[in-house]
């Protein structure tokens, strides 16, 4: 076990997930196969996301560690009174990949539209613009895509991923020809996904070496309900 991370508790009580070295390494191999740029050029990240959340603490920190990259800790964040610090940091550090939640992208896009110095520094080396944690609105996507193309003279990849604490975290990436707002993507390399009827919806279920074996100290009868006979983890997400 590398660490314990708690689920967000947004729909149920938070549960502890034993996150293993295998889960983390499988995730990073998924990412490397999806983003071969990481092998060509060691990634440079500026990141404010908390390490007790799987996006920041497993996904982003792991990208730097696995690929011999660099991660700078951003002491700003996309909230009132804090985002100016992020802007200052981005004028000092040009990331090769920038990862954020949609709220962060909304704030940054507005700043990029107004600040030429920021555009020059931010777009100097960046090859991938990545969001996760929630959906980026179509309007937000289009604004970001427009400012990137205007400044760089070409498209910069805007991508997203679907994941969760229990899978450390990746399950799907927006690869392939269809990349747009609202699209959750295709299964990550090594991840199997099936959709199971659940009422009038479909439940998202996953299987792979990146999936936890079970929650920490959850009763056996409760553990048995989260995995089916084929070994798929039932996420409870539609």
Protein language model features and the residues they cover:
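Short Gly/Pro-enriched turn/cap motifs at secondary-structure boundaries
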Residues: 178-187, 228-230
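Structural detector for helix-capping/boundary residues
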Residues: 21-22, 49, 191, 236
């Amino acid at each position: 076990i590398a660490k314990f991370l708690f689920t967000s508790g947004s729909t149920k009580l938070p549960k502890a997930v034993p996150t293993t070295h295998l889960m983390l390494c499988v995730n990073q191999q998924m990412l490397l196969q999806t983003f071969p740029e990481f092998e060509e050029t060691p990634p440079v990240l500026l990141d404010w996301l908390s390490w007790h959340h799987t996006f920041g603490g497993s996904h982003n920190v792991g990208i730097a560690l696995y690929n011999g990259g660099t991660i700078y800790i951003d002491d700003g964040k996309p909230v009132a009174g804090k985002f100016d610090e992020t802007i200052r940091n981005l004028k000092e550090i040009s990331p090769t990949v920038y990862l954020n939640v949609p709220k962060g992208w909304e704030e940054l896009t507005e700043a990029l539209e107004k600040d030429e110095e920021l555009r020059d520094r931010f777009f100097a080396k960046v090859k991938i613009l990545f969001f996760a944690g929630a959906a980026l609105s179509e309007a937000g996507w289009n604004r970001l895509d427009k400012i990137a193309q205007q400044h760089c003279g070409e498209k910069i990849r805007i991508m997203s991923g679907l994941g969760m604490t229990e899978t450390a975290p990746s399950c799907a990436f927006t690869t392939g020809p269809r990349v747009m707002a609202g699209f959750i993507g295709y299964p990550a390399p090594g991840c199997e996904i099936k959709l199971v009827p659940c009422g009038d919806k479909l439940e998202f279920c996953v299987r792979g070496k990146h999936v936890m074996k079970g929650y920490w100290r959850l009763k056996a009868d409760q553990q048995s309900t989260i995995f089916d006979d084929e070994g798929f983890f039932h996420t409870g997400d539609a």
